[in-house]
Amino acid sequence: MTETTKTHVILLACGSFNPITKGHIQMFERARDYLHKTGRFIVIGGIVSPVHDSYGKQGLVSSRHRLIMCQLAVQNSDWIRVDPWECYQDTWQTTCSVLEHHRDLMKRVTGCILSNVNTPSMTPVIGQPRNETSQPIYQNNNAPSKPTAAKILGKVGESLSRICCVRPPVERFTFVDENANLGTVMRYEEIELRILLLCGSDLLESFCIPGLWNEADMEVIVGDFGIVVVPRDAADTDRIMNHSSILRKYKNNIMVVKDDINHPMSVVSSTKSRLALQHGDGHVVDYLSQPVIDYILKSQLYINASG
């Protein structure tokens, strides 16, 4: 498959990120590497979406702190960003709602075809720009080669990086604004783009807990969007999926990353990180990046069991 016929993917991870760990970042990297190796996908971006404060989880520190820690954790990444939309809503949002928000938003700001897993575009190729006279923001006068889908969407991201949402005292975060004026950005209507939910096997297993998830939401998440699962602690994902009728029904929409099952980051968790911080355990440097640790110590977070 050529670059233009592959499905372009944005990986979206929802969660508490309380705090965000090296394991979370490695989850993105492992998922991207795995999808690229299949030869069917090009991952063009990753989104970290921390949960709203009203989620009510014990020990959950405020979104103000969690957003800043997430931003510090991805500051050196050229493809993963933090999106505060979920935190800035009036109340907690379901995972399904967050996925739908980003799907609808990307439709508006990129002009791309965003396909459901079960209804892929029949012509996943780059179309013609609507405005052939405008100077595209991706154009390099010294390199007049044809732009690729990934380059186009990458430059859309650069344009949007100037659009920030500011809510004092939270620092500035770049995110996609549905009211953004993209200026001379060319819109290509026939790039097949999907937003996939990225998660660990623990979230997948939670789908099997009766009453925890709304079944209609599960149908949309797994049936329409699709999931990329990065197993933790050598979890048996086949066994997990067999315990849910919806997961069995849409098993072809669930991609399990099969790389090194003994990956050192697969055992890292936010819970272990909080415990290490509370006990002064030096192993915390194995779990969290140094900028995140520095911020936690400066802000005196997770000092006691209540967060």
Swiss-Prot record:
Pathway(s) of this molecule: Cofactor biosynthesis; NAD(+) biosynthesis; NAD(+) from nicotinamide D-ribonucleotide: step 1/1; Cofactor biosynthesis; NAD(+) biosynthesis; deamido-NAD(+) from nicotinate D-ribonucleotide: step 1/1
Keyword Membrane: yes
Annotated keywords: ATP-binding, Cell projection, Cytoplasm, Cytoplasmic vesicle, Golgi apparatus, Lipoprotein, Membrane, NAD, Nucleotide-binding, Nucleotidyltransferase, Palmitate, Pyridine nucleotide biosynthesis, Transferase, Ubl conjugation
Alphabetical list of Gene3D superfamilies matching this protein: HUPs
GO biological process, one term: NAD biosynthetic process
Changes after translation: Degraded in response to injured neurite. Degradation is caused by polyubiquitination by MYCBP2 after recognition by FBXO45. Palmitoylated; palmitoylation is required for membrane association.
Record-linked SUPFAM superfamilies: Nucleotidylyl transferase (SSF52374)
Regulation: Inhibited by P1-(adenosine-5')-P3-(nicotinamide-riboside-5')-triphosphate (Np3AD) and P1-(adenosine-5')-P4-(nicotinamide-riboside-5')-tetraphosphate (Np4AD).
Enzyme type, top EC level: transferase
UniProt: NAD(+) binding residues: 16-17, 92, 95, 200, 202, 212-213, 232
Family according to the record: Belongs to the eukaryotic NMN adenylyltransferase family.
The protein's role, per its UniProt record: Nicotinamide/nicotinate-nucleotide adenylyltransferase that acts as an axon maintenance factor. Axon survival factor required for the maintenance of healthy axons: acts by delaying Wallerian axon degeneration, an evolutionarily conserved process that drives the loss of damaged axons. Catalyzes the formation of NAD(+) from nicotinamide mononucleotide (NMN) and ATP. Can also use the deamidated form; nicotinic acid mononucleotide (NaMN) as substrate but with a lower efficiency. Cannot use triazofurin monophosphate (TrMP) as substrate. Also catalyzes the reverse reaction, i.e.
The protein, known as: Nicotinamide/nicotinic acid mononucleotide adenylyltransferase 2
Organism: Bos taurus (Bovine)
